[in-house]
Amino acid sequence: MTSAYDKLHSTLDVKAFGRVAVLYGGKSAEREVSLKSGAAVIEALTSAGVDVVAIDVGDDLLARLQNEKIDRAFIILHGRGGEDGSMQGLLECLGIPYTGSGILASALAMDKLRTKQVWQSLGIPTPRHAVLASEQDCVAASAELGFPLIVKPAHEGSSIGMAKVNSEQELVAAWKDAAKYDSQVLVEQWIHGPEFTIAVLRGQVLPPIALGTPHVFYDYDAKYIANDTQYRIPCGLDSVKEQELIDLTARACDAIGIEGWGRLDVMQDEQGRFWLLEVNTAPGMTDHSLVPMAARAAGLDFQQLVLAILADSVATRG
């Protein structure tokens, strides 16, 4: 029996990938998550027979890429230096094909403000927001947006530096904390309602996942540590709303230029409307991660998932 997801599978012989550098670790605030993701990807590719070179990205990266005679790179770096277009630019200069989105889409997706501006320009729903650079900005945002609000560093992932606030005093404190991670800080309207995450792979939207957590929101602990986070596949939406969510995901990813794979985070408000939060171009691949869960629901085990991501780099970049 055929499935709508059958075309996601890699049909390539592993020799077609050549010598593959798995780029992980790095120096961003998400290093620990990337180390776990990288270890899982390395194990899966190695067991599939791929010629893998594991590279914990540091100051010797350029020399290692050249000395190891790398044919292709699997980017599983999270955050700055790996997910923001800079690594993609380096690999383009070296002529090394790589997984995932290109330079522009990676840079856009890593910048929450620019992502929102692109979506807004196309009429794609995303929560109202303001940029915080001073206590005066906090006062103005409080008056304009009301409470509750959520504060976010504009260029961090894994919910690092994020906080929900219910007063102007809390907003000022959260802005100061977020500013330790990023010179640009966003504050958004808090959306009351369920949260969904939707993975995309090789141009296809995978089954949406509904998230539930006893935490205030789906924070770092809920994502990577806690065992009380709830994941629901099927997501519980009726067929019409689920298709609306899938179509919105495809449109939002196309607007940013997402390639290969990624993951979109979405809220649904009390009126049933969807609001896009952000998109990740190199999502987590740990034992708590969401893309592997969505892939399983689409009929791909973890090894098949990483081979599909790698195969897409052959299709798009040779």
Swiss-Prot record:
The keyword Lyase does not apply. It is an enzyme of class 6 (ligase). Keywords: ATP-binding, Cell shape, Cell wall biogenesis/degradation, Cytoplasm, Ligase, Magnesium, Manganese, Metal-binding, Nucleotide-binding, Peptidoglycan synthesis. Mg(2+) 2 binds at residues 278, 280. Mg(2+) 1 binds at residues 265, 278. It is found in: Cytoplasm. Transmembrane segments: none annotated. Its EC number is 6.3.2.4. Gene3D superfamilies: 3.40.50.20, ATP-grasp fold, A domain (3.30.1490.20), ATP-grasp fold, B domain (3.30.470.20). Pfam families: Dala_Dala_lig_C, Dala_Dala_lig_N. PANTHER family: D-ALANINE--D-ALANINE LIGASE, D-ALANINE--D-ALANINE LIGASE B. ATP binds at residues 142-197. Pathway: Cell wall biogenesis; peptidoglycan biosynthesis. One of its GO terms (biological process) is peptidoglycan biosynthetic process. This is D-alanine--D-alanine ligase. Residues 116-311 form the ATP-grasp domain. One of its GO terms (cellular component) is cytosol. InterPro entries: ATP-grasp, ATP_grasp_subdomain_1, D-Ala_lig_Van_CS, D_ala_D_ala, Dala_Dala_lig_C, Dala_Dala_lig_N, PreATP-grasp_dom_sf. Cell wall formation. Its cofactor is Mg(2+); Mn(2+). Belongs to the D-alanine--D-alanine ligase family. GO terms for molecular function: ATP binding; D-alanine-D-alanine ligase activity; metal ion binding. Binds 2 magnesium or manganese ions per subunit.
